[in-house]
Amino acid sequence: FVQHASDMEPCGEEEVRRFLEKLYQDTGGDNWRFQENWCTDKPLSEWGSSVKYEDGKLSLILGENNLHGKIDLSGCTALVSLRCAKNSLTEIDVSGCPLLEELDCTNCGISGLDVSGCYSLRRLLCGYNSLTELGLSSCPYLTELNVPYNGLGTLDISSCMALTDLNCAENRLEKLDMAGREGLRMLFCYGNRLSVLDLSKCSSLTLVNCGANELTRLDLSGCEKLGRLYCYDNRLETLDLSDFAPLLSELYCYGNRLTELDLSGTDRLSQLECSYNNLQRLDLTGCKSLRIAGCARNALRSISLFGCEMLGQLDCSGNLLENIDISACPYLTELICTDNLILSEIPESFDRLTLFEHDIRYEYSVEKDAVTGQEKIVYMDRGKGWWYSGEPDKGYHGR
C-alpha cells in the first residue's frame, strides 16, 4: 500500500487551489480567525501560515480557526497533513488521500469521519467527538490512534498491526482484540464495557489503563516491560503480576474483588493503590521503592512494612488491623489508620508525622459537679483507638 501511495502522482497546484477554495466556502471561511490571502491569486505558498505547500505536498494547520460545517478533501492526493482540532464541524471526508500521514480533528463535534484509502496514515487523533463508527481497514501503517470520548460500540483494528499507541477510552466498547501485538507500547481503554481483556504477548507494553470497565479477566502474560498498570473499578478476583513484577512502578487496582495480591519481586514499585477490595493480608516486604500506599477499605488483619524504607504516605483505614508497625519506615510522614481495631499507646516516634489520622480511645468532656458546682473533666473509653502517655488522667489527647 505504501509503495502504491508513494508512486501516485499528487494533484497539481491548480487542483489543490480548487480544493482549498471549496474548503473555504464549505466551512465559512469569511468568519475564520486566520484567512490571510486565502482565495487570492497569490501562490499557495503565500496563503498564510495555515497553508504549507511544497514539492507538490499540502499541509493544513486550521486548529481553533472557527471552521463550521463539513470538511471535504476527498481525492486530494497532495494532502499529507491536516490539523483542524477545536472547530465546530459536522463531518470530515479525507477518503482517497493516499499520501495523508497525519490527521488531528480532536474536539470538533463531528459525527462522521471517512479515512478510506488513506494508505499512508500513521497518526489519527479524533477524540472528543460524536463518532459511532470508524473504518480503519485501509490504514495498515497506523501507529497512533487516539479516539477517546466518542460513542463507538465497536472498534476494528485488525488491519492496524503497526499500532504502538492506542487510546480508545470512554466509549461503549464491549470487546477489544489486542493479543499478540508485540509493538504496542501504551493502551488506554478505560471507561468502556469490556468484560475480558487479553493482552498476552504484548511484549512492548509499558503502560495500561483499563480502569472503569466490567473486567472479570485480565491476561497480562508475556507483558514483560509493563511498568504502570491501572485496572481500578472492575470485577477482578485475581491479578497476576509475575511476568512484569521487576519493572512495575505504579499499580492502581482499587475497586475490585481481590482477596490476595502477590507483590513479591516488585522492587521498583513506588505507588500502590489497592483500596476497596477484599484483601485479608498485605505483604509489602521488600518494596524498597514504595513511596505511596493506599490499602483502605479491605479486610486486612495484618500488613507488613518491613523493608519499605522509602514509604512516605500510608492509608490503611477501614480494615481489621489490631496493630501497625512503622519502625521500618523512617521517611513516613502521613499515616491514615482510622476505623480499625487498633488499641495502642502512641509512641514518641509518631511525633514526626505531619498527618496522623487515627481513632481516639478517650473522648473528653466537661461536666459540673452536682454537689460543688465546679467543672471537671470526664472521659469515655471507646475501647479501641490510640492514646498518648498519661491519658486519661491528664484529661486531654496530646503529648
Question: Which residues make up each language-model segment?
Answer:
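Consensus "Asn ladder" position of solenoid repeat domains
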Residues: N65, N87, C108, N129, ...
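Ankyrin-repeat and related helical/solenoid repeat scaffolds used for protein-protein interactions
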Residues: G294-A296, R301, L305-E348
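Conserved hydrophobic beta-strand positions in leucine-rich repeat
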Residues: L58-L62, L82-C84, E101-C105, R122-C126, ...
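Extracytoplasmic Gram-positive cell-surface binding/anchoring modules and repeats
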Residues: G395-R399
